[in-house]
A protein has these predicted regions:
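Acidic beta-strand-to-loop metal/phosphate-binding motif
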Residues: 114, 152-164, 183
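Short, aromatic/basic amphipathic alpha-helical patches
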Residues: 167-176
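TOPRIM metal-binding catalytic domain and adjacent DNA-binding surface shared by DnaG-type primases
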Residues: 1-65, 69-71, 106-107, 207-213
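Metal-dependent DNA phosphodiester-chemistry modules and their immediately adjacent helices/loops
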Residues: 184, 195-213
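Short, acidic/turn-prone active-site loops that include or flank metal/cofactor-
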Residues: 135-141, 160-163, 184-187
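Conserved catalytic core of nucleotide polymerization and phosphodiester-bond processing enzymes
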Residues: 147, 157, 174
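Phosphate-handling DNA/RNA-contact segment within nucleic-acid enzymes
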Residues: 51-153, 168-169
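Hydrophobic anchor at the start of a short beta-strand
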Residues: 131-132, 155, 178-181
Length: 213
């Protein structure tokens, strides 16, 4: 798995931020509940709330902190608004987007799922047994991700039910060999479908992609 090159001081700062914000995750209890995610489940991914920002993080105050954690440590943090803020997501100044939940690549066997966004990836990981990575937005697919995913027999793209989601799936299928696209209904994403239909809805469709015949 390709990781970002950060200095030791940058890594230490990201770790400090992750720990500080994760300690205040209870502030997001109601927001998480609206997404059918518990505080305990959110803590698996060290999600947090920017209640007391570290220097330089003042623009993210009040947002949900989503750290990108790899075997080598925290490599990035993205910040999601919880009250309809615009933009919905904010990234660190100068940071390059990367793949979310790369640990799944080490535990996956024959197939792996790909979501558009961190939250859908989190939901797949805590609510199902399907190894899943996330790409932070349909426009953030990068060519070197092919090297990461090419080892798997089947790559299952869980595409949002909109034009961007469809293009996201098509883009990955053009670059990888064995890709199955599971499109969500119009206007839906993985999280909303889990809320409406339960994880069984996705389990059934994923099984169809990985079961021969």
């Amino acid at each position: 798995v390709i990781t970002l090159r950060l200095s030791s001081s940058q890594r230490q700062f990201l770790l400090q931020a992750t720990q500080r914000y994760a300690a205040r995750i209870e502030i997001a209890t109601d927001y998480l509940a609206s997404r059918q995610l518990s505080v305990e489940e959110a803590s698996i991914f060290h999600l947090g709330v920017v209640d007391e920002p570290l220097p330089g993080h003042e623009p993210y105050k009040g947002r949900l902190a989503i750290p990108y954690i790899t075997p080598s440590g925290v490599v990035d943090i993205r910040f999601r608004g919880m009250n309809g803020e615009d933009p919905k997501y904010m990234g660190l100044v100068g940071a390059k987007t990367t793949m979310f939940n790369t640990q799944a690549c080490f535990v996956a066997d024959k197939y792996i799922c790909v979501t558009e966004g961190e939250f859908d990836c989190i939901m797949m990981t805590v609510k199902t047994n399907h190894p899943t990575v996330g790409i932070p937005g349909a426009n953030n697919w990068k060519p070197h991700y092919v090297k990461i995913l090419d080892d798997f027999d089947v790559v299952i793209v869980l595409a949002d039910g909109d034009a961007a989601g469809l293009e996201f799936g098509k883009k990955i299928s053009r670059e990888l060999g064995s890709v199955n696209i599971i499109s969500m209904p119009d206007g839906e994403d993985v999280n909303s479908m889990m809320i409406k239909q339960g994880s069984e809805w996705l389990d059934e469709r994923i099984r169809e992609c990985v079961t021969p015949g």
